[in-house]
């Protein structure tokens, strides 16, 4: 079993910075704001070929109220999940009452705990950590996570010996296939497209929407545990959380994202970071669930987010949350508004649910699988060309300057989203209305549901363009005889 290491401490002691160092990513938000990390953030790390899971947690300072109380609960849950705890303190701030309270709790859990004093850059490490011996946790390991100083020593002298003592049994990571594919893509070693099997990889599912529409409640309902901080306050999820899961024998990676606000309202620098994370999560996903609040209706921000999803070419499932408790009259009004404002999204399934009570949630994954299968289905050139020919027979392309646009053949140009490349003459002059007709014809013929489909046009090249008319020897002899005949006749 892969060991789990939790980073625990007061807010702003550098847990996320160390997390990014250990996992060699920038997945955890890092800035000089207390309470920046609100949820457990999981990452994969490695030292000398030994893998471990690192958990970045929200800070605990003993003065929590409101959402901070829930942050503290998330940190305590991380301690329970972990095999070993790295308890981080701030060498510059010195020993604080909250440090003593955390140390007391850790001693009561009897977990292997190592005390790490961060922010020792520019200080005498020996002098800076003296006060922390009062915590009674043994040796102190000074580091400067932002510059990487002392981190390698921490790994070699603390985590590596501990993992060797742990001697984990060889087991197959249930998500190994996902990570192997991820690394192959990072190294440019992905398999040839012909060998690619979309069913062999987890479906990456991003849950997005405006703040406080119920994204984290939906995530927790799907997972069956309180994994993401939920509180009735906009913006309680500031980072994107990647969660492996399995449902009906199919593997998924669930991405719970920060709520997206209007740009004009994003004044907090941290929230700007989160919006970028959300948009990156959409790019990284295979299927996106757009969550809309039934009681607030569709806002311009919902439409902006929808536009980004469509431009990214991601498969889409629209989820209208908080459907419970609405009168029948209000429900009809909401449906009419949806039809009016989302009429251009005719390929996406719409689900009406209550994430809080669970009604309608069970039907979501059928649409997710349908959308993913539609976006990754392989279709041969012969079938695409046949569909194109039928479309042309049903409705001829218009005349352009007195000449009919000629479509020759079609082939697949990519997947997720499906791309159909059509070759022909004068295709650049096709009107948008005919392009939409072709797109809808391909969608209907291929039964593509839940995924956008893109049509690209390529102009057929004239093989004789810019070439001199070179005569063959036979043509040359005929030409000579013709010229002699013309001269004699004169």
From Swiss-Prot:
One of the entry's Gene Ontology molecular-function terms is: GTP binding
Q: Which UniProt keywords apply?
A: GTP-binding, Nucleotide-binding, Repeat, Ribosome biogenesis
Enumerate the CDD domains for this protein: EngA1, EngA2
Q: Which sites bind GTP 1?
A: 9-16, 56-60, 118-121
For this protein, the record's InterPro entries field holds: G_ENGA, GTP-bd, GTPase_Der, KH_dom-like, KH_dom-like_a/b, P-loop_NTPase, Small_GTP-bd
Q: Name one GO biological process term.
A: ribosome biogenesis
Q: Which residues form the EngA-type G domain?
A: 3-166, 203-376
Does this UniProt record's set of keywords contain Repeat?
yes
Determine the domain of life of the protein's source. Answer: Bacteria
PROSITE patterns assigned: G_ENGA (PS51712)
Per the database record, which ranges form the KH-like domain? 377-461
Protein name, as recorded: GTPase Der
Q: State the taxonomy lineage.
A: Bacteria, Pseudomonadati, Pseudomonadota, Gammaproteobacteria, Enterobacterales
Q: Which gene encodes it?
A: der
């Amino acid at each position: 079993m892969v060991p789990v290491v939790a980073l625990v401490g007061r807010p702003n002691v550098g847990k996320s910075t160390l997390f990014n160092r250990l996992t060699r990513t920038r997945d955890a938000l890092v800035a000089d704001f207390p309470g920046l990390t609100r949820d457990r953030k999981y990452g994969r790390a490695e030292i000398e070929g030994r893998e471990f899971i690192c958990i970045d947690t929200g800070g605990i300072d003993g003065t929590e109220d409101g959402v901070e109380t829930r942050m503290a609960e998330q940190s305590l849950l991380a301690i329970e999940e972990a095999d070993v705890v790295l308890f981080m303190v701030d060498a510059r701030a010195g020993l604080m009452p909250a440090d003593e309270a955390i140390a007391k709790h850790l001693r009561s859990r009897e977990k292997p705990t190592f005390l790490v004093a961060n922010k020792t850059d520019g200080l005498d490490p020996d002098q800076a950590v003296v006060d922390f011996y009062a915590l009674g946790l043994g040796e102190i390991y000074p580091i400067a996570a932002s510059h990487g100083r002392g981190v390698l020593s921490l790994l070699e002298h603390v985590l590596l010996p501990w993992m060797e003592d742990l001697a984990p049994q060889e087991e197959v990571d249930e998500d190994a296939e996902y990570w192997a594919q991820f690394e192959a893509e990072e190294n440019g070693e992905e398999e040839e497209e012909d060998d690619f099997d979309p069913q062999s990889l987890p479906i990456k599912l991003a849950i997005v929407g405006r703040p406080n529409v119920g994204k984290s409640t939906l995530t927790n309902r799907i997972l069956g545990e309180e994994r993401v901080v939920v509180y009735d306050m906009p913006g309680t999820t500031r980072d994107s959380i990647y969660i492996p899961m399995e449902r009906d024998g199919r593997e998924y990676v669930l991405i719970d994202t920060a709520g997206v606000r209007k740009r004009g309202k994003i004044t907090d620098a941290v929230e700007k970071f989160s919006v970028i994370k959300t948009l990156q999560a959409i790019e990284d996903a295979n299927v996106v669930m757009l969550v809309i609040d039934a009681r607030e209706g569709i806002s311009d921000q919902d439409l902006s987010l929808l536009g980004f999803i469509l431009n990214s070419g991601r498969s889409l499932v629209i989820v209208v949350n908080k459907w419970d408790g609405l009168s029948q009259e209000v429900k009809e009004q909401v449906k009419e508004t949806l039809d009016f404002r989302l009429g251009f999204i005719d390929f996406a399934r719409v689900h009406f649910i209550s994430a809080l009570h669970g009604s309608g949630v069970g039907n979501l994954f059928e649409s997710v699988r349908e959308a993913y299968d539609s976006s990754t289905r392989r279709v041969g050139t012969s079938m695409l060309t046949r569909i194109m020919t039928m479309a042309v027979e049903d409705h001829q392309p218009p005349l352009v300057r007195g000449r009919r646009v000629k479509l020759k053949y079609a082939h697949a140009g990519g997947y997720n989203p499906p791309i159909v490349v059509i070759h022909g003459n004068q295709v650049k002059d096709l009107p948008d209305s005919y392009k939409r007709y072709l797109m809808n014809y391909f969608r209907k013929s291929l039964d593509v549901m839940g995924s956008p489909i893109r049509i690209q046009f390529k102009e057929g090249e004239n093989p004789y363009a810019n070439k001199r008319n070179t005569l063959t020897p036979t043509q040359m002899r005929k030409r000579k005889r013709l010229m002699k005949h013309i001269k004699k006749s004169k």
